[in-house]
Amino acid sequence: MAKKVEAYIKLQVAAGMANPSPPVGPALGQHGVNIMEFCKAFNARTESVEKGLPTPVVISVYSDRSFTFITKTPPAAVLLKKAAGVKSGSGRPNSDKVGTVTDSQIQEIAETKAADMTGADIEAMKRSIAGTARSMGLVVEG
């Protein structure tokens, strides 16, 4: 018989840097999950991801206080800021441009995000990511 899911917890945790401090500790502690066990498993699973990159994770907590988790790809906005070399997007994206991204960089981000995005094809994903870039005040070249 399958275990009963008690809760789903959605967090963004820096890859390879999960520790019991907030936001991880309190979110897991209130459901009675072994926090250090999660931190060790998460850090091991995100070894291949660039250290410190915010990584979304969905944790399923079961009635016996065990858990499983799924890591997702970093948010498109984070990948775009990294590609453009800027710290943050523009406060006024239509008038103040803060950086540029090329079509090849958008292609690379779309391929990275392909597993998580529900776009029909890679071109649709590229258009979606280009729209995100424009809404952040980035100029899309190409």
Swiss-Prot record:
**Organism domain of life:** Bacteria
Name of this chain's protein: Large ribosomal subunit protein uL11
Which gene produces this protein? rplK
Q: Which GO terms describe its biological process?
A: translation
Query: Keyword annotations for this protein?
Result: Methylation, Ribonucleoprotein, Ribosomal protein, RNA-binding, rRNA-binding
Cross-referenced HAMAP family: Ribosomal_uL11
Q: What does this protein do?
A: Forms part of the ribosomal stalk which helps the ribosome interact with GTP-bound translation factors.
Q: Where is this region: Disordered?
A: 84-103
Quaternary structure, per UniProt, is:
Part of the ribosomal stalk of the 50S ribosomal subunit. Interacts with L10 and the large rRNA to form the base of the stalk. L10 forms an elongated spine to which L12 dimers bind in a sequential fashion forming a multimeric L10(L12)X complex.
Q: What processing steps or modifications follow its translation?
A: One or more lysine residues are methylated.
Q: Which GO terms describe its cellular component?
A: cytosolic large ribosomal subunit
A molecular function GO annotation: structural constituent of ribosome
Write down the NCBIfam families for this protein, in alphabetical order.
L11_bact
Return the similarity comment. Belongs to the universal ribosomal protein uL11 family.
Its organism's taxonomic lineage begins at: Bacteria, Pseudomonadati, Pseudomonadota, Gammaproteobacteria, Vibrionales
Family annotation (Pfam families): Ribosomal_L11, Ribosomal_L11_N
Q: Is the keyword Glycoprotein in the record?
A: no
